[in-house]
Amino acid sequence: MMNRFRKWLYKPKRSDPQLLAQFYYADEELNQVATELDSLDGRKDPQRCTLLVNQFRSCQDNVLNIINQIMDECIPEERANRDFCVKFPEEIRHDNLAGQLWFGAECLAAGSIIMNREIESMAMRPLAKDLTRSLEEVRNITRDQALRDLNHYTERIKEALRHFDGLFAEFELSYVSAMVPVKSPKEYYIQQEVIVLFCETVERALKLEYLTQDMIDDYEPALMFTIPRLAIVCGLVIYSEGPLNLDRKPEDMSELFRPFRTLLRKIRDLLQTLTEEELMTLERSLCISQDGEFPTSSTNDPSASTGPDSQTEELEKEKGVEEVVDLTLFVTQEDSVWKEEEEKQVLPESSSESEEEEPIDADLACSMQYDEEEIEQLNMMVHQVGDEMSTLLSPPSQNQSPAHRPRPYNGSSLEGSSATSSTQASPRRAPGSYHDDDRVFFMDDLESGLSSELCRGQLPLPTVCLRSPEGSSCNGWLTVCQSSDATNLGCQRKLSQSTESVGNSDRMVNGWEGLQDEDSVQTAEEIANRTGGMKLSATVIFNPHSPSLSDLAVVLPQSADAPEGGEGGALVATQCLLNSCVCCAGGCVDNHEDAMEPAGRSMALGFEKHKLTITSSVIQSAVAAGSPGKGNGHLPLTLPPSQGHLTHSVPNCSVQNQAREDEGSQDGIHYPCCEKCSPGVLLAQDRGSGHEGGPSCTLQDTGCQTQHNASVKGRSECFGKQSKDDNRKINSSSQESPLSSVPSSDIDGVSVTTCSLSSSYAPSPVSSLTTSSDMSEDLDHQEIQVALQAAKLAAHNKIRSRFHSSSDLIHRLFVCISGVADQLQTNYASDLRSILKTLFEVMATKTDQGDNEKPKKGPCLGSAVLEDCALCQETISSSELAAKAREGQFEDPPEWVPDEACNSCIACKAPFTVIRRKHHCRSCGKIFCSRCSSHSAPLPRYGQMKPVRVCTHCYMFHVTPFYSDRTGI
């Protein structure tokens, strides 16, 4: 009774702008529609029921909007946190989301279950009941206050609003998370990094004129494909520490690129071998949407015409950019890259099967496919291309895959073919299998790492020639040039010694093929143990029984009368281990031969990752590189400086055995020695060795007598006896000083003491080479640089040797990068669309927006009003429109804007093109693009009872904002 009097006395006017008055009439309208809907039988009049349901949801949304404004005015500092809303997909972030949540809460509270979300529905039902009760309480309290004082909010209202706001925020997160995937805070942050990468990519593309600002402002459709492609290149090469940093853990990567992690590693390694010109060519190609426009003209490989001097200049440029990293980490990471997934696929052996797969590879070259069959092929592209591409980027495996086992071929010898042919560029290819060259990729299983390949001799190595110091040194270090001697690529290489006193024992190893004695196979670790447990400066492991060991040879100074022989496996392995200069206490390792008279002589250097450690006194490193071939991207390799063709002997050697001294001091012997230790160099003089004319050195005699005419076998046996005595000495010796033993080996003898950086023999005043710790650190740093550069050269040459030319490499990169980028359009369309939308907002030309830039605090009725919208200017209520529809009083539909009068979308201003077509809204008659008019709803005021196309604005504010035949409740 009191409420009736209060309503009669204090009922607010409909025109009152105060929020409590607006809420009163909005709540009244909602109750009227709810009452009519309850009394209606939906089976008898389904169309009427549909209209009432849509009107009911519209009224709910109106009530919630007003409550939201009341909370902003009543409890502005006590609102619930809604930062999680930024993680919601763009499709559901609109002003009428609150009404949908209310409708969902009522359905759940009444016992309904969300389709395919039974568990989530059961979990949310208690929260939904609490929310509906709280909302009813807020409505009753606010309605009662509207009949009292419109300018005052009681404490009871504030408390009810706080409780409702917290429950509503909790239900919003739970309900939306159950319906659509919602990112975690970490995933959202990673996506923000991807957006930054895309923006940086576009900014760089604008500077390099790959793109134009007009294309950004006009929302060019081709940019949806171009920008992700360029972003992959920039993320792997330019901004390598960003979200595409492949050194991160997989869970730290964006979910967009995580499935392509292995393939991205391969792409990154290929991109790092490109020159600046090749990279620009690739990026320009990625900006072309039609594959037919890809440049197919074969260009000469820039590396083919790049001389040692220009390579040195390029290296100096790279030094200014790249940090010198720890060599152990570098090699470990390089090896780990090649081990991941190469066992997953093996190409068929028969050429007919390979030829059948060629059309598939040809189809992969297309970056955009629209019919169903090609889309299916595109979905398979990432895995297929990734597997096939592994061979291009990976070193050969320890066990050859069936596709690359040696095949019989007639009349084709390696020596008879061109030294620069593509089949010789990679010794892994069988000379008769030329059809492999036409394939997109080859496949090798990556069972083992690069060190195992060195053991088996299956890794091609670069031709290194040492030249005279004049005009060929770089900061005192010799450079590497490609040997012009084509015979270095042959199967047979010679190993000879220049010792005159033991000429009868000289041996020549022809391709290592004659070494079949199992006992002659010696690893570096075994030799280290036999020589007293010393840490060798160069760890090289050879397997003389490898069938392809002809590609791995050590060329030493050769005497004219060196006879050939089939023995000496242990000798060869030991010679390789001793083939380094260890004259400096700080660890100066020279991985080159110093007495190579022919300029075309090559030297093979290798490393084993398990033995590769870097300390202040020990560096066990060597170089693995690819054989020169067509398409190689040669990088300069700097080796420790040499005095050219050194012929200096070591006069100041203190020995305990005269026979050993006679052998070690002959004029014809050339000791591996670096520039820092050779006579006449200031650095050697500053070491305070106490001797002039050359470095001090000491031969540690162990009681093993060596005869001048002893055979190699006898020397090996003597060498084995010596190791026992050495081991006894090691156990009792002191290791207080990291003094180095100078190598004094005869080139043909293995019984002499090996060179070492961390010898455990007792220090001798005569053999000590003292130096400061600073000098040692400097030398270590230089050696790390040398080994790092050598390893990079090896990896780059290995990769480039598998391609015919530069254009071939660029085209295959184009295929792979386009495949990954275009796959994002299918697998992650929503995320990519959100990223590109933010990108266009940031990179588009800024215009003066005035008051439109003011952020909205929340859903607001005023924000829905458009000045040029006739429907927004109407004052008629939705209930009046419903009454007219019931009476059959239909209005005339609005006039359509002529097609020629509009060239861009009314909403997003995107220009219309052949792809972006014009669409009229049936509610307002204006022209929109397909994205801005993607909704359908009935228009009862115009007599349209079936859903028709309407724009987003009309759908949200003027017709049936919640109509959808895809409702999940």
UniProtKB/Swiss-Prot annotation:
Zn(2+) 1 binds at residues 905, 908, 929, 932. GO terms for cellular component: cytosol; early endosome membrane. It is found in: Cytoplasm, Cytosol; Early endosome membrane. InterPro entries: FYVE_LST2, LST-2, Znf_FYVE, Znf_FYVE-rel, Znf_FYVE_PHD, Znf_RING/FYVE/PHD. Gene3D superfamilies: Zinc/RING finger domain, C3HC4 (zinc finger). PROSITE patterns: ZF_FYVE. Residues 411-423, 732-745, 756-769 have a biased composition (Low complexity). It comes from the Eukaryota. Residues 295-310, 391-402 have a biased composition (Polar residues). GO terms for biological process: negative regulation of epidermal growth factor receptor signaling pathway; negative regulation of epidermal growth factor-activated receptor activity. SUPFAM superfamilies: FYVE/PHD zinc finger. Zn(2+) 2 binds at residues 921, 924, 951, 954. Negative regulator of epidermal growth factor receptor (EGFR) signaling. Acts by promoting EGFR degradation in endosomes when not monoubiquitinated. Belongs to the lst-2 family. This is Lateral signaling target protein 2 homolog. It comes from Danio rerio. The lineage of its organism: Eukaryota, Metazoa, Chordata, Craniata, Vertebrata.
